[in-house]
Amino acid sequence: MSFSPQEALQRTIEHREIFFDEMVDLMRQIMRGDVSPMMTAAILTGLRVKKETIDEIAAAATVMREFALAVPVADSTHLVDIVGTGGDGSHTFNISTCAMFVAAAAGARVAKHGNRSVSSKSGSADAVEALGAAIELQPAQVAAAIEQTGIGFMFAPIHHPSMKVVAPVRREMGVRTIFNILGPLTNPASAPSVLMGVFHPDLVGIQARVLRELGTERAMVVWGRDNMDEISLGAGTLVGELRDGKVREYEIHPEDFGIAMSASRNLRVDGPEQSIAMLRAVLDNTPGPALDIVALNAGAALYVAGVASDIGDGLARARAAIANGSARQRLQQYVDTTRTLVA
């Protein structure tokens, strides 16, 4: 007998956990459209108020992966996702998108999962499209792009068609729900390593442990103390690192890597055009905090991808890829390849 939505709602009201198998059953019902919009909204609200557990998040992510259109990557060596939950309210330029090109040029292979803007001035999909790349690639085309360029951008609506069922509910609710933290956990290419930014410090340890439950090999989950969902230059950054099946939590600072502190307001943009201008300036090796934060985050991605021995080594590799022009070339190669794939 399936786990009833009414029982799920009752559990959340009483601040009791929904167990893994029950949550899998419930999420399948929701994703199939078997649960009414009103009941779905009530359950999502109850989970948020109660605070979602590691098992509840892992179970929900497992089902979203089940329903996703997977990208058939033949070789996942050094394959990493660089992703953020968004919702940090910082309105910075597309740091993780820029880091994607840098990390790929420095030896990683990046399968980045993203969407258009919801809370930011420019979502990752908006940025990749504004750079001239085709974003609406089918799974086999994404796999081909990864094979040819070391980069694959996966536009979330294409890979998660079942999300159409809950989209109207989420839109009408207008508040964060479990789905805001599920997106970064449901990479359609099943990248074995991930650099993930989160919007709340509590999620640093939680998401690292959820990734472990989901079988991720290496991960860094980060939250900047200035409320950035990236490794920050403006404050310390809390890290939950998953390695060898263990989660270690610690804090890093830009000075640890010889980088001057810089407030996040120096990285703010008013829209996609400004974001793209800042991204291109970084790839043109223009010195400043924008280049520093991209190199640091790309360096961390190179570390979790197994390309670099530590973040410092990754940072040096990232800076070299920017300085020698290979990151800029990789961007152009990706743009040209995606256009050819959809032609």
Curated annotation (Swiss-Prot):
Q: Which InterPro entries match?
A: Anthranilate_Pribosyl_Tfrase, Glycosyl_Trfase_fam3, Glycosyl_Trfase_fam3_N_dom, Glycosyl_Trfase_fam3_N_dom_sf, Nuc_phospho_transferase
Short name of one Pfam family: Glycos_transf_3
The Enzyme Commission number assigned here is: 2.4.2.18
List the record's Gene Ontology CC terms alphabetically.
cytosol
* Cofactor binding, note field: Binds 2 magnesium ions per monomer.
Which amino acid positions bind 5-phospho-alpha-D-ribose 1-diphosphate, per UniProt?
84, 87-88, 92, 94-97, 112-120, 124
Give me the disulphide-bonded residues.
none
Q: Which domain of life is it from?
A: Bacteria
* Annotated pathway: Amino-acid biosynthesis; L-tryptophan biosynthesis; L-tryptophan from chorismate: step 2/5
| SUPFAM superfamilies per UniProt | Nucleoside phosphorylase/phosphoribosyltransferase catalytic domain, Nucleoside phosphorylase/phosphoribosyltransferase N-terminal domain
Q: Where does anthranilate 2 bind?
A: 170
The residues that the entry says bind Mg(2+) 2 are 229-230
| Residues the entry annotates as binding anthranilate 1 | 84, 115
Keywords from UniProt, A to Z, are: Amino-acid biosynthesis, Aromatic amino acid biosynthesis, Glycosyltransferase, Magnesium, Metal-binding, Transferase, Tryptophan biosynthesis
What name does the UniProt record give this protein?
Anthranilate phosphoribosyltransferase
To which species is this protein native? Stenotrophomonas maltophilia (strain R551-3)
